[in-house]
Structures are given as structure tokens and as C-alpha cells.
Amino acid sequence: MTNVIKYLAEGEALPLEDHPSVLLPASYDIVWSLVVFIIVLILFWKFVRPKYQEVLTEREDRIKGGIQRAEAAQAEAKAALEKYNAQLAEARAEAAEIREEARAKGKQIEAEMKAKATEESNRIIESGEKQLAAQREQVVTELRREMGQNSISLAERLLGDQLSDDVKRSGTIDKFLAELDTVSPAGK
């Protein structure tokens, strides 16, 4: 350390300090640093860069493949959505058609049932009218017979004489009933 102080006191430079610049290293340091840098650069260029390029290319291919797969999946999904929408529209149209057919069939069944009910009602009314007419005829016939008998008895009492002849009896009954019909028509 005394040597350093001696050199500094005399104003001389230290033995390892030949160069005047503080920022620039010694020339031999620059040369050897360049040699090592070139060797490292060559090694990097020969071994690291191709692997790095291969990894980048592979990654680029994977990204492109992923994009293509995504586009294909998106196109497939879009096609599936369009197919689904088409099937949905078809199903809705079919449902509307079935609904309309059911309405038409329901109206047809309703009309048939109304027609059958009307027909049955008319048949029942007609049957009732026929039955009523038959009963009316039966009642009229019974009334004529009874009235005929009653009129004969009444006529015999009034005349005091007995009508023995069936022809006379029948004629008298018919005449009486004809007069009765002209005065008041039967059943009306």
C-alpha cells in the first residue's frame, strides 16, 4: 500500500492504469470479449436458433390449426343451428297442420253429431206424432163406438121403440157422427 501512496504522491499512474479513459476498457479485453461473443453468437446461430425457429413454426402451425378447427367447429355449429331451426320450423308447421286437422275433424264430428241429434230428434218427434195420431184414431174409434151405442140407447128411449135392424142402427150412428164431425172436427 505504501507503493500506491508513493506513486500517487509523485503524480505517476499506477502500473495497471496505462490508458487515460475511464469509460473504455483495455484493448485486449475488447478483443477477447469480441472473440467470446462471436463464438457464443455462432453457437446460438447453429444450435439455439433452429430449435427456437422450430418451436415457433410448430406453435404457429398449432395456432393456425386451432383457428381452422375453431372455424370448422363454428361452421359446424352454425350448420347445426340452421338445421335445428329448420327442424323447429318444420315441427311448428306440422303442429299447426295437425292442429288445423284436429279443428276440422272436431268441427266435422260436431256437425255429424248435430246432424245425428237432429235426425234422432226428428225421428222421435215423427214417431211421437205417429203414436199420437194412432192413439187419436183409437180414441176417436172408441168414442164413435161408445157414442154410437149411447146414441142408439138415447134414440130408443126418445122414440120409445127399439132399433132392431143393424143396417138402420149403423146408418143412424153414421149420420149422427157425420153431423158431429161437421159441427166440430175430431181432434181439432
Swiss-Prot record:
Pfam families: ATP-synt_B. Keywords: ATP synthesis, Cell membrane, CF(0), Hydrogen ion transport, Ion transport, Membrane, Transmembrane, Transmembrane helix, Transport. The keyword S-adenosyl-L-methionine does not apply. Its main location: membrane. GO terms for molecular function: proton-transporting ATP synthase activity, rotational mechanism; proton-transporting ATPase activity, rotational mechanism. It is a single-pass membrane protein. GO terms for cellular component: plasma membrane; proton-transporting ATP synthase complex. SUPFAM superfamilies: F1F0 ATP synthase subunit B, membrane domain (SSF81573). F(1)F(0) ATP synthase produces ATP from ADP in the presence of a proton or sodium gradient. F-type ATPases consist of two structural domains, F(1) containing the extramembraneous catalytic core and F(0) containing the membrane proton channel, linked together by a central stalk and a peripheral stalk. During catalysis, ATP synthesis in the catalytic domain of F(1) is coupled via a rotary mechanism of the central stalk subunits to proton translocation. Component of the F(0) channel, it forms part of the peripheral stalk, linking F(1) to F(0). Belongs to the ATPase B chain family. HAMAP family: ATP_synth_b_bprime (MF_01398). This is ATP synthase subunit b. It comes from Corynebacterium diphtheriae (strain ATCC 700971 / NCTC 13129 / Biotype gravis). The gene is atpF.
